[in-house]
Every structure is written in C-alpha cells, then in structure tokens.
Amino acid sequence: MVIGPKSAVFTTVRARGGSLFHLDLHLQRLARHAAVLGIEVPEISIPEGLEGLIRIQIDNGGVSFHSKEFYQEIHMDAEGITVPAPRWSRKIMGTKHGDWDAYRQITSEVLNKGADVAILIHDYCVIDGDRVMPLILDNDGVVWISDSKLGGVDSVTFDVCKGAIEDSGFIISEGRLNERLVARAKEIVLLGTGMGAARLTVLDDIDIGDGSDNLQKVCIEALGDDWR
C-alpha cells in the first residue's frame, strides 16, 4: 500500500445545484498532478446534485467525492497570517497530493485565530496560500506571481482569470515575491475555489495595498455570476 504524498491526488471544485464550475480545467490539472505522482486516473463519473466545495480524490480505493459547505464569504476583504510553507521533494512540490494534512492543519489554526487565510513563506518569499494563489500588483501595473519552480500549486482559478487580467492591460510576470514587493504592493488578490477573488487587506496586522481594487474587479468579472 502506497503511503505519503504519492498515495493520492485530488482537486477541489466549486459546485452549485449540481453544476461544477470549470470542471474541465480541474480534471486536466488532476491528470497532470497524477502523472507526476505516478497515479493512474480511472474513468471519473460525476454524481448528480453536488453542492459546496467538492474534493475529487483518486487513491488506491478509486475515485471518491467529499463535500464541504461553503464556509467563507466569496470575494472578501481578507486578513492573512504568514506561515512557513510545508515542504516536500522538488518533484512533489506544486501538486495536490496525498500528504495534505500539513495544509489542513495550517488552515485550521489560521481560522481559529480569527484570520481568513494563510500566506505561505519559504526563503523569505511568498510561495503560495493555504487555499489560494496570491497575485501581487505593483505600481507599474505588473501582476507578480510566484515562480512555479518555487513550489506553489498551479491554480485553476488563476487560469480562468488570466486572459481577462492580460486583456485589461496588466502584465503578468513570474518571480520571487519578496518582502519588499509585498510591502510596496498596490493590491494583492487571492484566487481560489473557496474564496473566489479575495483582496488581501491586512497581513500580520499590517495594512496591505493602497485601497484600490482594480485587479480584484477584473478577476471577479472573469469568474462570472456563478461565483456568488
């Protein structure tokens, strides 16, 4: 029996009234991550009437579906706490794998402290969020995302919004999201299945951004009316 990160692969989809948002993109990511982890993807048959946050998981028992009620306001102004990023081998990093309890524990601790999200740090840089992908807008109109080689999970929500962000005149660039970039950010948007397009307004009790929400508005419009 396989244990550890290669024991399972999963993705979490937003569902309302049996409609799973951007399911095709989620299944594509599931297949990519499964290939990295050495997990064979069987035929997936989606049950009817799913509602909430739906985790689709593949392990040695086959395909399973786990639902959780929506528990956070969509597109919120979020308060975050920095937390050291969990680390695995370079090959494992960036996948939604079977050793995810470290992330779940971080989420639980952050919510118990009254915050909304964890911002994950490694080597003095923002790598990812516990359930979101951070986008940092600087004063030159560049939207910075963490270099994929640093270990962040590729985001389906970002894939949905990317075209609209570029069409709005923003330049997307990968790099190291260091403390200086965060401190001088014009706006930080957090994209994720559960939070939609949230705006980070406080991090470790320090105000973030200049109060503008132009990038957030672009992302909210890209996600559409279903994200409510």
What annotation goes with each model-predicted range?
Residues 1-123, 149, 158-228:
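Conserved alpha/beta cores of soluble small-molecule-handling proteins
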